[in-house]
Amino acid sequence: MAQGSHQIDFQVLHDLRQKFPEVPEVVVSRCMLQNNNNLDACCAVLSQESTRYLYGEGDLNFSDESGISGLRNHMTSLNLDLQSQNVYHHGREGSRVNGSRTLTHSVSDGQLQGGQSNNELFQQEPQTAPAQVPQGFNVFGMPSTSGASNSTPHLGFHLGSKGTSNLSQQTPRFNPIMVTLAPNIQTGRSTPTSLHIHGVPPPVLNSPQGNSIYIRPYITTPSGAARQTQQHSGWVSQFNPVNPQQAYQPSQPGPWTTYPASNPLPHTSTQQPNQQGHQTSHVYMPISSPTTPQPPTVHSSASSQSSAHSQYNIQNISTGPRKNQIEIKLEPPQRNSSSKLRSSGPRTASTSSLVNSQTLNRNQPTVYIAASPPSTDEMISRSQPKVYISANASTGDEQGMRNQPTLFISTNSGASAASRNMSGQVSMGPAFIHHHPPKSRVLGGNSAASPRVVVTQPNTKYTFKITVSPNKPPAVSPGVVSPTFELTNLLNHPDHYVETETIQHLTDPTLAHVDRVSEARKLSMGSDDAAYTQALLVHQKARMERLQRELEMQKKKLDKLKSEVNEMENSLTRRRLKRSNSMSQIPSLEEMQQLRSCNRQLQIDIDCLTKEIDLFQARGPHFNPSAIHNFYDNIGFVGPVPPKPKDQRSTIKAPKTQDTEDEEGAQWNCTACTFLNHPALIRCEQCEMPRHF
């Protein structure tokens, strides 16, 4: 790739890859070369490219091979419909499923190699396919690694087949697709929660494969012990069905050890009339790469079931720790017509999987898990467990079998979970899931619907569901944020897991005996599940009642608060009205002038009274201010005063008096009565008028 060029600044490349994870690394490298490692210029260009790659407008066709044509528009619409190999469907028809963003592509793990030959694409391996596999058909292929990053919530896929005109109907191309989950996923509301794959290839008549899903864990460390003949002991015809449990009992159970849900039978075929409800199969696969000594395989060996709860087997859920695992639950559709049941042969204990064995119809999915050594391409990503999901038309043609459209899911795990088992440690690599359409048997006009594959991750906050449905749009599965296994499907849909029909056994007494033992075991496990479910329901009902009581108390408190708020609002309204009324009583301008004149007059009166009080205090306590105004009323006779008779004594003393007056000063004249007073007097002798008024 462009990383090998000495002109690229790897620090800038790393920053741009972190900032624009949805843009392929080839585009980022080319942009850096064009802009001479200028970070700002590259950000400006990649911000435009990011929108294209986010919303399905970019070009992911990094290879000219026609087999990669299904990866256009960032795996928005993965049409692998094998009936229309000669027609190229546009890839954007499913780009807005559930309002989701599309999965973006990354070539960090290498370019997509769709042009490999059949010999390069499918490596030779031990017998890991069902017994009816045609000669030379290898169920599991080994595609080169490819990458995608930043899966977003509610990712919608339409799994149908895209082909080109140069491909024939009998030889569909093997289109590997890899979806990589970012290792730094943060917990939050925007955490990726679900992955939908819709559109299963239609059933093919007289197909020996049936509707099957194959899960194949790859071993990154080649080991002879890992390639034991015990891996494919379920497919050999020399298998002894009398004691089938020997293949499932490891000497030392580890975290990834699996126990069968029922007694497996090598290729039993039973009748189940009027089968209703859903049959489910569960596969738990590790998200983080576990370390197990030998990776044997487990096949969903299925015999008949009749328990009301046996079809929802959760008894193996608590077997060992399931941290960082993916659960793949297979729920076939409802089918009322009677059909034959096919059960696959038993396998050994799973390396990193937990399979609940189910009675599987030919029109219902089966799960197969096989182990195989890795290739040179897989040695690069040995710490990343991967899941390959492919849909095959099962036409019976060997070349058509080998060219299988495949979906490759890779989860980047930070640390690998260690587990102890019988021998050394082996890091588990990818696993394959091959989906094979069943034989189409139409009885009475009833046709089989498509199965649904749900992939979840228990004991974590992320849930990934893969739904396969060709006839209806994808359902919203937002994921379950819970640290424990969820029983919501069982509680919310109890009718889907009820089966009361009787089972017709084969004439072989040995097989019938093993079948009855399996049914008895499933009945006991189903009763345990029913008891646990009943206890859980009682607990949930008690919790619901307590929450209802708390809700009533909160409602009463809310009503009380509402009444108080209303009372306070009414009081505030009254105060505002009162204030507005007082503001309306402001006096006019004329009234203000009158009040001002009154205030001035009052101030004058106050000053006069103050002076009178001071005068009263100066004259003494006997001062009568009212007497000042009527002084002349009481003055008496105002005529001339007759002269007094002259006396000798008075004439002699007169000059002496004149001298005393000159010495004391001039007499002062009263302003009220004009009486001459002595200079020493401050008041008039006649009228008591002050000298200085």
From Swiss-Prot:
Going by the UniProt record, its keywords in alphabetical order are: Coiled coil, Cytoplasm, Endosome, Isopeptide bond, Lysosome, Membrane, Metal-binding, Methylation, Phosphoprotein, Ubl conjugation, Zinc, Zinc-finger
Which compartments is it annotated to reside in? Membrane; Endosome membrane; Lysosome membrane; Cytoplasm, Cytosol
From what superkingdom does this record's organism come? Answer: Eukaryota
Q: Does the keyword RNA-binding apply?
A: no
Instruction: Recount the PTM note.
Output: SUMOylated by TRIM60; leading to inhibition of MAPK/NF-kappaB activation and the innate immune response.
**Residues in cross-link Glycyl lysine isopeptide (Lys-Gly) (interchain with G-Cter in SUMO):** 329, 562
Q: Which residues carry this modification: Asymmetric dimethylarginine?
A: 173
Entries under Pfam families matching the protein: CUE
**Modified-residue entries (Phosphoserine), positions:** 372, 450, 482, 524, 582
Which residue stretches are annotated zinc finger (RanBP2-type)? 663-693
Which membrane topology term applies here? Peripheral membrane protein
Name a biological process GO annotation: response to lipopolysaccharide
Q: Which Gene3D superfamilies match?
A: DNA helicase RuvA subunit, C-terminal domain (1.10.8.10), Zn-finger domain of Sec23/24 (2.30.30.380)
Coiled-coil regions, chain positions: 532-619
Q: Low complexity composition bias: which ranges?
A: 286-310
- Give any GO molecular function from the UniProt entry: K63-linked polyubiquitin modification-dependent protein binding
Transmembrane keyword on record: no
- Locate the cross-link: Glycyl lysine isopeptide (Lys-Gly) (interchain with G-Cter in ubiquitin): 611
Name the segments for region: Interaction with polyubiquitin. 675-685
The record's region (Disordered) falls at 90-117, 224-310, 330-361, 564-583, 640-663
Listed under subunit, the entry gives: Interacts with MAP3K7 and TRAF6. Identified in the TRIKA2 complex composed of MAP3K7, TAB1 and TAB2. Binds 'Lys-63'-linked polyubiquitin chains. Interacts with NCOR1 and HDAC3 to form a ternary complex. Interacts (via C-terminal) with NUMBL (via PTB domain). Interacts (via the C-terminus) with DYNC2I2 (via WD domains). Interacts with RBCK1. Interacts with TRIM5. Interacts with TRIM38 (via B30.2/SPRY domain), leading to its translocation to lysosomes and degradation. Interacts with ASB1; this interaction promotes TAB2 stability.
Record's domain comment? The RanBP2-type zinc finger (NZF) mediates binding to two consecutive 'Lys-63'-linked ubiquitins.
The protein in question is named TGF-beta-activated kinase 1 and MAP3K7-binding protein 2
Q: Where does this protein come from, organism-wise?
A: Rattus norvegicus
